[in-house]
Each structure stands twice: as structure tokens, then as C-alpha cells.
């Protein structure tokens, strides 16, 4: 028998909460992609820094999409969640992972080796928490002004915009290898 989550509220809201919890609090997810930044071959590619960034991070996005599907699809189907909410939760998971990934690059680029790893992790958690906190605030406003379905749409669009903006802020990191040694 599938766990009945209806006592906790909307099944869609519970699914979104699980997605957010796992995306935010699973710290070991990012893997070893940042070794790409130390690989000189990435910087020798005759391409723009934006494409180099994409080449270095694309597999992490694919991994996030697969992990999100493995997480969201079985729960959403078992709980009979509306397909719009299932797809939205899946994409929100992918965008949250992209925000985590690009925030790590951005914070590491700004702080370089000036602070220890613990301080960099705390700064990164603070920045990620602020970004996600704004998203939660926007979702609450969307629920108050419209309805719960609109909140999913708002979170989805906000996550996409933030992933792109933070990604664009990290592009300079992929220009030349020596800039952050």
C-alpha cells in the first residue's frame, strides 16, 4: 500500500516539499564535476566561455533530470498527483540543482582561496537560502493572489530565471584558466 499523505495537505504540496527538501539538503549531490575546472583541455576549446561552462556542467544537468524523474514520477503517479504538478516538480528539482551548481561556481570564483572551505560552504548556503527564500515568498504571494496551481507556475518560472541568471554570472569563470589560481 502506498503511504497516504493526504493528512498532511495537498498531495501536490507534499510532493513539492519532498522535492525541495531533497534538492536543498542533499549536499553531496554535486559530484566531481568541478574537476572539469582544473582540466586545461576545457580552457583550450576554441569556443565561448558560455559554451565551455555548458560543456563542463551538462552532465550534471542530465544527472539532475534523471534523479528528478526517479524521485518525482513514482511518487506522483502513486499519489495520483495531477500531471502538471508532476512535471512542474520534476523541472523545479532540475532548476534547484542547477542553482546549487552555479552558485557553487560563483561563490568559489568570488572567494577564491581567501577563505576556508567551511566559510565558503556557509556563504554558499546563505546565498542559496536567500534565492530559494525569495522563491518561497513568491509562491506564497501566488497562492494568496491566485491559487495553488499558479504557485507551481511561479516557482517554475522563478527557478528557471534564477538558474539562467546565476549561470550567466558564472560564465567569466570559464574564460581563462589562470584567473582563479
Question: Which residues fall in each region the model found?
Answer:
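Hydrophobic alpha-helical transmembrane segments of membrane proteins
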Residues: 1-39, 49-181
Amino acid at each position: 500500500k502506498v503511504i497516504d499523505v493526504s493528512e498532511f495537505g495537498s498531495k501536490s504540496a507534499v510532493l513539492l516539499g519532498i522535492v525541495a527538501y531533497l534538492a536543498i539538503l542533499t549536499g553531496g549531490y554535486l559530484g566531481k564535476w568541478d574537476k572539469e575546472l582544473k582540466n586545461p583541455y576545457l580552457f583550450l576549446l576554441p569556443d565561448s566561455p558560455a559554451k565551455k561552462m555548458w560543456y563542463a556542467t551538462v552532465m550534471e544537468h542530465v544527472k539532475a533530470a534523471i534523479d528528478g524523474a526517479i524521485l518525482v514520477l513514482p511518487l506522483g503517479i502513486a499519489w495520483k498527483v495531477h500531471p502538471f504538478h508532476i512535471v512542474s516538480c520534476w523541472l523545479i528539482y532540475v532548476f534547484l540543482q542547477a542553482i546549487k551548481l552555479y552558485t557553487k561556481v560563483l561563490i568559489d570564483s568570488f572567494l577564491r582561496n581567501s577563505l576556508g572551505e567551511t566559510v565558503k560552504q556557509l556563504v554558499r548556503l546563505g546565498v542559496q537560502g536567500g534565492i530559494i527564500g525569495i522563491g518561497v515568498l513568491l509562491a506564497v504571494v501566488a497562492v494568496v493572489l491566485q491559487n495553488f496551481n499558479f504557485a507551481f507556475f511561479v516557482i517554475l518560472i522563478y527557478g528557471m530565471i534564477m538558474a539562467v541568471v546565476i549561470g550567466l554570472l558564472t560564465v567569466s569563470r570559464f574564460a581563462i584558466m589562470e584567473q582563479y589560481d
